[in-house]
Design a protein with these regions (language model features):
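Hydrophobic packing and interface segments
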Residues: 1-728
Length: 728
């Protein structure tokens, strides 16, 4: 089939994104890295980060090799899968890993340069940190669109089975991205929190030395962890959501407009790709708008970032109307409002996250106040606030789902096959809308760890009080953007997972068609699977709440979220114990560390975190892959759909709770460090340090990893659909 000329905007946008990422990287590298001590600290962090990444990619490489052999056997041996699947799976993982590598490399080079630029002015420091974060954002969208464009062209040339087959096959490269993302998130989260918890317990609580103090042996490992978890991990997470939303929406478009003719169907497939492509150019505009003035307050700094992100979001909303109108897609106006629903949901979730986690607002201030009565009340208050904080994001996502569904199908509640298909396409388009400005939203996320490392570098390099004041301001801004970024990642994961859930039925349809299965439709007529629609499949597999397979699947899905969280929390605990023991040993055995005359063995702490992360990340990650396969073989399609619904509902709510509780504990401690309730060293401060330490794995390991779990279970189910059908 002929590819429309307008499609080539997608690869052009990817090349522009990658070109601008390279430009920002070279501009950052031209900046001065500072004093010899600043360079030395940056080198320690860079070596530690790259050593970890090398080890992680070795482990992931083994897992990918095993899965690739399995997919090849399913495709060429059992003939239950498209023969392109093993190759698509590999490219998804490769590009996700490549994005993480580039982002990590940039961040580790940028921290010292940000600290040094802060010696000149606040604006200079902000620009270097933010544009270095933009390298991550632009690399993710650039590589994502490049992978999508290449596979669309290749499959369009070689796959003669039509657009539904092409788009569902492309979805399988999302499993490669999901698998890589899970290892990056879980491994990175364990690494960073083992170092952070160890540094806090022995350094702050026992030895009473400040954060990022060079006397603390775990300080370098802690700074390495910021890059490992919050740059590479967050990048892989959002790369997966970005590609998953575009590809699942393309697959839903192929299904929804299949009867409208090939031309309309093709337009529905490329529409999400074009929205994402235009989003690249508008994200770039937003990035260049971010700037601030000397002596800026936190509100000024937040406003400077908000200008960039809000301008990009408003313009992409306007551009969507133009794109869908020019494509002449049926109900283009309603679909445009579906995109706006997704964009609005992202903004509201971000604002709600800021309200519940920033110490500028009452929820976190109340946790600080609870510190006056001890650590127990801090923990109780934080858990309570975290649970309450789930209300707004859950309601927002629910409203966004309903609005995007109804706008796309013309407010038709009949649940007919056409109405359902168009509504599901609208939900997918909403997910694309939320992620369309990922170039700038991920830049604000990646900015956080760069600013944090810059503050650490300034502290360890003993820079002046004014410089520390500036880096503290940048770091405080980074904490806020990191919290809102986590909320955005969770919200986008929920919408993407729902779109993937709908795509699963299309993959089942293709698997049954390949197997030559005949089935009864809702009227009781015997038809080919190729001619069946979604209500026919729901009826055939008895997907309803009275089917015990669906209920059992939902229970297993909800349980999987808690099991996964429990395993990752315990993994952090075990790794942190080793770190605490090592830091205590060094304080005890290496003379002069606390006096500042002895040099800690930073490398040993980096090694402990690296080994712990590699060892501990395997079982939770493999479990996430195995659960959908086992449920599919035992409970069939109905059980898998129950699993995905239960996993989505339980995982989304639990992820919001953990991210917000952890963020609130962190900022409650910072609130006291700024002078509230007795300030640093007070009883309330020590109580809030305990809360912060408990919250670390909540917000940076288990919570963020759940985003990937709910998407990975959907991806695995899609890829294994042929096997599930074979076991019917």
């Amino acid at each position: 089939m002929m590819i429309p000329q307008v499609f080539w905007l997608v690869p052009i946008a990817s090349i522009v994104a990658l070109g601008m990422a390279y430009y920002f990287f070279t501009q950052m590298m031209k900046a001065d890295e500072g004093t010899p001590r600043m360079k030395e600290i940056a080198l320690y962090v860079r070596k530690g980060a790259m050593a970890y990444l090398k080890q992680q990619y070795k482990v992931v490489g083994i897992v990918f090799a095993v899965l690739c052999v399995l997919f090849a056997f399913m495709a060429y041996g059992l003939n239950v899968q498209n023969p392109w699947v093993p190759f698509a799976f590999l490219t998804g993982g490769f590009f996700s890993g490549l994005a993480g590598f580039f982002g990590m490399k940039t961040a580790t080079y940028a921290s010292a340069r940000t600290a040094n630029a802060a010696r000149e002015s606040l604006d200079a420091g902000l620009k270097i940190a933010f544009r270095s974060g933009a390298v991550m954002g632009l690399t993710v969208v650039g590589l994502g669109l490049l992978d999508i464009a290449i596979w669309f062209v290749v499959l369009n040339h070689f796959d003669a089975d039509g657009l539904i087959s092409i788009t569902t096959t492309m979805l399988t490269f999302g499993m490669g991205a999901s698998t890589q993302a899970l290892f990056a998130r879980v491994g990175g989260g364990i690494y960073t929190k083992a170092a952070d918890v160890g540094a806090d317990i022995v350094g702050k609580v026992e030895a009473d030395i400040p954060e990022d103090d060079p006397r603390n042996p775990a300080t370098i490992a802690d700074n390495v962890g910021d890059n490992v978890g919050d740059v590479a991990g967050m990048g892989a997470d959002l790369y997966e959501s970005y590609c998953g939303s575009v590809l699942s929406t393309a697959a839903l478009g192929a299904a929804a407009f299949g009867v409208a003719g090939l031309e309309i169907q093709l337009k529905a497939v490329i529409a999400p790709m074009l929205i994402a492509a235009v989003g690249v150019f508008l994200s770039l505009l937003g990035i260049f708008l971010v700037r601030t003035k000397e002596g800026a307050t936190m509100k000024d700094l937040l406003r400077s970032l908000s200008v960039g992100t809000n301008v990009s979001a408003i313009l992409i909303a306007a551009a969507t109307f133009c794109i869908l109108y020019l494509l002449d897609i049926q109900n283009w106006l309603g679909l445009s409002f579906s995109v706006i629903a997704g964009l609005a949901a992202g903004v509201i979730i971000g604002q709600a996250t800021e309200y519940y986690t920033s110490h500028s607002y009452k929820p976190t201030q109340k946790i600080s106040e609870a510190g006056q009565t001890g650590a127990a009340t801090v923990i109780i208050k934080g858990i309570g606030r975290g649970m309450i904080s789930t209300c707004i994001p859950v309601i927002t996502i629910g409203v966004a789902i309903m609005l995007s569904y109804l706008c796309a199908n013309g407010f038709d509640l009949s649940m007919s096959s056409e109405s359902l298909a168009h509504g599901l396409y609208g939900i997918g388009i909403a997910a694309v809308g939320m992620l369309s400005t990922l170039g700038i939203t991920l830049a604000t996320d990646a900015y956080g760890p760069i600013a944090d490392n810059a503050g650490g570098n300034a502290e360890m390099s003993s820079l002046g009080e004014e410089v520390r004041h500036r880096t503290d301001a940048l770091d405080a801004l980074g904490n806020t953007t990191a919290a809102t970024g986590k909320g955005f990642a969770i919200g986008s994961a929920a919408l993407t997972a729902l779109a993937l859930l709908a795509s699963y039925i299309e993959e089942i349809k293709i698997a049954m068609t390949r197997a030559g299965v005949m089935m009864e439709n809702v009227k009781g007529e015997l038809i080919s699977a190729a001619d069946a629609n979604i209500p026919d499949f729901m009826n055939f597999f008895q997907v309803n709440l009275m089917n015990p397979k669906v209920i059992v699947g939902a229970f297993v899905g909800a349980m999987a979220a808690f099991l996964f969280c429990g395993m990752t929390m315990e993994a952090v605990g075990r790794a942190a114990e080793k770190m605490v023991q090592e830091v205590r040993r060094q304080f005890r055995e290496i003379a002069g560390i606390l006096e500042g005359t002895g040099t800690p063995d930073y490398g040993r702490c980096v090694e402990i975190s690296t080994r712990a992360a590699q060892h501990e990340m395997v079982i939770p990650s493999v479990l996430a892959i195995l659960i959908p396969i086992i449920v599919g073989c035992v409970l069939g399609v109905a059980g898998v759909l129950g699993l995905l619904v239960g996993g989505l509902a339980g995982g989304f709510t639990l992820a919001v709770f953990m991210a917000n509780a952890g963020g609130a504990w962190d900022n409650a401690k910072k609130n006291i460090e700024e002078g509230a309730f007795g300030g640093k060293g007070s009883f309330a401060h020590k109580a809030c340090i305990v809360g912060d330490t408990v919250g670390d794995p909540f917000k940076d390991t288990s919570g963020p990893s759940l985003n990937i779990l709910i998407k990975l279970m959907s991806m695995v189910s899609i890829v294994m659909a042929g096997l599930t059908v074979a076991f019917m």
